Amino acid sequence: MAKYNIGAVVAEFNYDITQMMLGLAKEEAKSRDCEITQVVTVPGVFDMALAIKKLLEKDEIDAVITLGAVIEGATDHDQIVAQHASRKIADLSLEYEKPVALGISGPGMTRLDAHKRVDYGKRAVEAAIKMCDRLNEI
């Protein structure tokens, strides 16, 4: 039995990048005796909040990781998406009293930058597990 069951919400936008992030996240979870038990794919980072909420409502989910890549475009859209998504993600973690780890790279980065940051998937799992451990100590 896994130490912690982790849900993952993964953006389809920049799919090639987010799938690499998910692969690294699954490897990291397994190496730490945890498991990503449910993966929910959403259109983009801005669309994550409802899926995160649904996962947090499940008793069997101990934490949620978010995986996405917000790449800079011709407008400030990437800034708006990242700011609003990260704020809502933090709010959901507080509301449900479960860790929600931010594995979203960007904003203000190029596609090449995003490829260099696929390890955010691994980092999100690390953060989720550390938070579960710390919360269990309280």
Curated annotation (Swiss-Prot):
Could you name the active-site residues? H77
Residues recorded as binding 5-amino-6-(D-ribitylamino)uracil, renumbered to this chain, are: F13, V45, F46, D47, A69, V70, I71, L102
Please give a single GO biological process term from the UniProt record: riboflavin biosynthetic process
Superkingdom per UniProt: Archaea
Q: What is its EC number?
A: 2.5.1.78
Query: Which pathway is this protein engaged in?
Result: Cofactor biosynthesis; riboflavin biosynthesis; riboflavin from 2-hydroxy-3-oxobutyl phosphate and 5-amino-6-(D-ribitylamino)uracil: step 1/2
GO cellular component term, pick one: riboflavin synthase complex
NCBIfam families from the UniProt entry: lumazine-synth (TIGR00114)
Q: What does this protein do?
A: Catalyzes the formation of 6,7-dimethyl-8-ribityllumazine by condensation of 5-amino-6-(D-ribitylamino)uracil with 3,4-dihydroxy-2-butanone 4-phosphate. This is the penultimate step in the biosynthesis of riboflavin.
Q: What is this protein called?
A: 6,7-dimethyl-8-ribityllumazine synthase
The organism named in the record is: Methanobrevibacter smithii (strain ATCC 35061 / DSM 861 / OCM 144 / PS)
